[in-house]
């Protein structure tokens, strides 16, 4: 369980995340964290959340966001909403570190997802770009309700269930 003020780092993608409001603090209503993106930082794959909205508020630099097929450049003071179910991805194409506040409503167990994926990447257990391996993604998608945008969700849930039944970690 994450704690406010706790910082985690993904050494592969160049992200530094500091938890501000956690699920336990907000009764599960909200997860909020400060995110720093080094130049070239990117989420390694487009994805969608089936149970949560995600909001970015840029503090410094700019963040490129693709929601569905539409691309946006978000500047300091601007916010953007990624509605649940809509595929999205983001990246920092600038030469400076970008900073933003990221919110998930409701919180669900998303903080656990970030702790897990940052840990896997920083331990060299993901693909070189920081994306989870097929087996990691299959196990985590149903656990955290984060899905690939093209493969039917019901199929991803079934595969995730099977993988989690046999997970020997």
What are these regions (language model features)?
Residues 1-30, 41-52, 62, 66-169:
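Jelly-roll (double-stranded beta-helix
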Residues 32-36:
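Short amphipathic
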Residues 56:
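Structured binding elements
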